[in-house]
Amino acid sequence: MSLLLSNSALVGPKFRSSRISHASASLDIGLQRATSPQNASVATCFEETKGRIAKLFHKNELSVSTYDTAWVAMVPSPTSSEEPCFPACLNWLLENQCHDGSWARPHHHHMLKKDVLSSTLACILALKKWGVGEEQINRGLHFVELNFASATEKGQITPMGFDIIFPAMLDNARGLSLNLQLEPTTLNDLIYKRDLELKRCNQSNSAEKEVYWAHIAEGMGKLQDWESVMKYQRKNGSLFNCPSTTAAAFTALRNSDCLNYLRLALEKFGSAVPAVYPLDIYSQLCTVDNLERLGISRYFLTEIQSVLDETYRSWLQGDEEIFMDASTCALAFRTLRMNGYNVTSDPITKILQECFSSSFRGNMTDINTTLEIYRASELILYPEERDLDQHNLRLKTFLEQELSSNGFIQSCQLGRNINAEVNQAIEYPFYAIMDRMAKRKNIENYNIDNTRILKTSYRSPNFGNKDFLSLSVEDFNRCQVIHREELRELERWVIENRLDELKFARSKAAYCYFSAAATIFSPELSDARMSWAKNGVLTTVVDDFFDVGGSVEELKNLIQLVELWDVDVSTQCCSPNVQIIFSALKHTICEIADKGFKLQGRSITDHIISIWLDLLYSMMKETELGIDKSFPTMDEYMSNAYVSFALGPIVLPALYLVGPKLSEEMVNHSEYHTLFKLMSTCGRLLNDIRGYERELKDGKISAVSLYIMNNGGEITTEAAISEMRSWIERDRRELLRLVLEENKSVLPKACKKLFWHMCTVVHLFYRKDDGFTSLDLHGVVNAIINEPIVLNQF
């Protein structure tokens, strides 16, 4: 880890050689088309950007904290209270004052004036304590006097504990005979805010007050019980991994472990310290999270795997760096669980219990922590995690209230589109937003600055930088070019197979392709995308044929043709519509089977035909039930309805085309069928909830109407829908658990992910309206396929 001496230096200089993941080399297919000098230059820039990002995995840079360095500079020698223990820190302060008299970091944000005031006053106190730097002290005092009004300015971001620490430092300044000419009204306002903050803390429970006061120990003066503070000392000797708090503790108690921590920090960083140390696990997880959320993780698979393995080892060892920090714990839990590691949710539940234990909001005053905990609390896999479920609902309500009242303004990151980010987290749960859609939103909401605020501001290129953004934008747009060409190919396929001549069928090629491109977006997975999209079009056509377009004779004829397979369509099709549909089916199945044969090394034709026959049989059964006006039991209905929802032909053939070998034993395994049933059941129930009233008017059955009927008509529609939603929730969580599970799994993870991807598709499609009728989808389709991201718009 090294320190960044400038807040603006988020990205280091270019370097000649770097470790780039070889595991993802094949994923550049279709992207490196350097057919002109301009394209060659773009390709070179692309690789250089990847190289700089790869370098972040081998170091963790943090910005210097002048505030913390000042408090460390105040530490007296253990052998003489008249001498500084760390004169190098004192020299650093003397050499790093700004031209305006402050000790601000270069290019500091205009909303960080309170931070600058606090840091500057701390530096003045350090110099005055040791009787050095009279010129710097006078310039610093002049800066504080000129900018003192900012200490109570409402539009400024207030660092943690500022309302207590800053007045305490002013008292210290008076005790050191520093002559500060301060505006009386502002000073009175500051004292009033300090008293208000102390009163608020005293009204919280004793444990919360104690930990908060311990964290801002340097500002508590005679109110501080230093022995109680030391309960929070960590194994590395620090208090909260915070140099300023630890320095104040050593000054008060001469604790040797505190001193050892400070010495180790300075051995690591030289003559200045960061605001938090160590931060290695969090920094590395932030890098991984940035890459995953922006859609560029596939370029760094080896590096990411190394971080995940190391984080998991630290998790199992109970590392304080993870479990003593809410943000790190939540991020580690979410990242590990979503990558298939077996981690318990107990630490997240404990954090949430502490957050909601009283009116003192503790961790939830910081937007980073709040969002991390919320995202982590969504990842419920097991029935016994019900407590986490309840806390998630409460946290969602809290976020909604804070959003409506602009409660995050004081705690947000600088330059961050916080409203959009929080709104996205609330409106689009992780299970109801398609992968590429989420990536685009994350890119659009991305904040290059990514300054964090504790008692002072701090930054790291691992938290965020322009390389993450530029690589993700370039990658998104390159993939989009490929996707647009594939959509044109799909539209040609529709015409070539005469599907456009079927007047009864909905024209949904763009939507079908969109669901493929938004979930299976990598360039080299073109065959899987096209299989998904073409079968999506065909299932829509067949669904409309069974629903409104075909007679019973035509439906039976279509099924018979698929059963026989090798037929003369000119003589054995009973109508032009049947001929068009069967011909398109056969041509597409054979095309997909040929591609699958090349990847799998065995014939998959019979299996794909079987998948289609299962769908046709289930649709025919529904037709016959409608004709007979008979009402099955709920179990009878669902045993057929999950198949007739028609996800089988879309998802199952595509499994053969995503890369891994899929043996006959695998596709006959119970895991394969369970994944399919869970995914399809979610889709069927979502569809039946949204279409309940329409189906009721048309005299058709649905899961909702049958549930009411099977319960003697004694429950309300609302109660029936509530039961359906609970069913969906159970199956969705079980599906995710099986997708993420690796130890007992038979299917390759790349194949299992497709079941989850489709689950997110149906959750999005049925969010508001009934399936394809959602007006929101039109804009989303354009954003994913047609509209490039323009970097200079950010």
Swiss-Prot record:
GO terms for molecular function: ent-kaurene synthase activity; magnesium ion binding. Its EC number is 4.2.3.19. Binds 3 Mg(2+) ions per subunit. The keyword Secreted does not apply. Mg(2+) 3 binds at N687, E695. Involved in the biosynthesis of ent-kaurene diterpenoids natural products such as oridonin, miltiradiene, eriocalyxin B and nezukol, known to exhibit antitumor, anti-inflammatory and antibacterial activities, and in the production of gibberellins phytohormones. Catalyzes the conversion of ent-copalyl diphosphate (ent-CPP) to ent-kaurene. This is Ent-kaurene synthase 5, chloroplastic. It comes from Isodon rubescens (Rabdosia rubescens).
